[in-house]
A protein has these predicted regions:
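Active-site pocket-lining/capping segments in soluble small-molecule metabolic enzymes
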Residues: 1-143, 147, 153-296
């Protein structure tokens, strides 16, 4: 049976959630779909110079985080997708220490944008694998193909607007299909032309550099992320899409975004993508829901 591998958000940011969820996932397999598993969990601690995509907010200890991943056989990934790195940034002690820990663990990866960082990590930490970040905004199919041809990347995350270019995607050779990692639940406006500028603003912020704050001009931007809105996005990939379309076509890797969101919403992602509908209430009860919980 072909298995869908999910790549989940919040390695550091949602450590406490995963401390509750992963034992449940292991001890009650009957609650969860048997056609999918957890391929990796990605994220970055707060104040990481090499960080990108989102400003990291995780405060959990790296040793605790990596011990949890090791206990459950899950690949940890560092989100180091800053697109504005310069040579002097490669000496950053904290980011190097994190990479060293992953390198020693043997199954860790780094999500990145910068070729400068890629070359440095290849030379310095040979046990790491690399993921080409969606922050590259690969909206052109020839650009995606060129990225898939790069041997240094184990996975490539295309822009979500290529998710349903099914005829072109299906024509890829299987070796390239194995590398595609679809971003499933993006809520960003499908017609956005500022996505690259948005990511660059985050990169500047992580470097501590001055710059104009990016202002999102998308319709309904003030409403923030809503999963219900993401489900209406033309680029959305849902459970039925994965089972009926992507797995039969030979695609197995699916990324769930959400590092900057609250843990309650991330739990909803875990329920939707991993959990059988009839068991979702049981998972909520195990994680947080009891008969004395008040909302108001």
């Amino acid at each position: 049976m072909t298995i869908a591998h999910y790549h989940l958000p919040g390695l550091f940011e949602f450590y406490e959630l995963y401390c509750r969820f992963l034992p449940l996932y292991r001890n009650h397999p009957e609650y969860f779909y048997d056609w999918c598993d957890i391929g990796s969990i990605y994220g970055a601690p707060a104040d990481c110079l090499w960080g990108g995509g989102r400003v990291g907010s995780g405060e959990a200890s790296a040793r605790d985080v990596l011990a949890l991943m090791r206990d459950y056989g899950i690949s940890p990934r560092l989100t180091f997708s800053n697109s504005l790195l310069r040579a002097e940034h490669l000496r950053d002690a904290r980011c190097n220490a994190l990479c060293r820990m992953l390198n020693d663990g043997g199954n860790g990866g780094v999500i990145l944008h910068s070729d400068l960082l890629l070359r440095y990590l290849q030379k310095t930490y040979p046990n790491l694998y690399f993921v080409s970040s969606t922050t590259k905004v690969l909206t052109s199919f020839p650009d995606l193909q060129a990225e898939l041809e790069r041997a240094e990347f184990r996975y490539v995350v295309p822009d979500f607007r290529l998710n349903h270019a099914l005829e072109k995607l299906n024509a890829l050779p299987q070796g390239q299909k194995d590398k595609v990692e679809f971003l499933c639940n993006e809520c960003c406006y499908f017609g956005c032309r500022d996505r690259r500028a948005c990511y660059e603003a985050v990169s500047r912020k992580n470097l501590g550099e001055d710059g104009d704050e990016h202002r999102c001009h998308a319709p309904d931007a003030a409403g923030g992320y809503r999963f219900s809105k993401a489900m209406e996005n033309p680029g959305f990939i849902g459970v039925a899409d994965i089972q009926r379309t992507y797995l039969p076509m030979g695609f197995e890797n699916f990324k769930i975004e959400g590092r900057e969101l609250g843990s309650a919403l991330v739990l909803e992602f875990l329920l939707y993508y991993l959990t059988k509908p009839e068991c979702q209430l049981k998972v909520r009860e195990e994680i947080y829901l009891d008969n004395m919980l008040d909302l108001f």
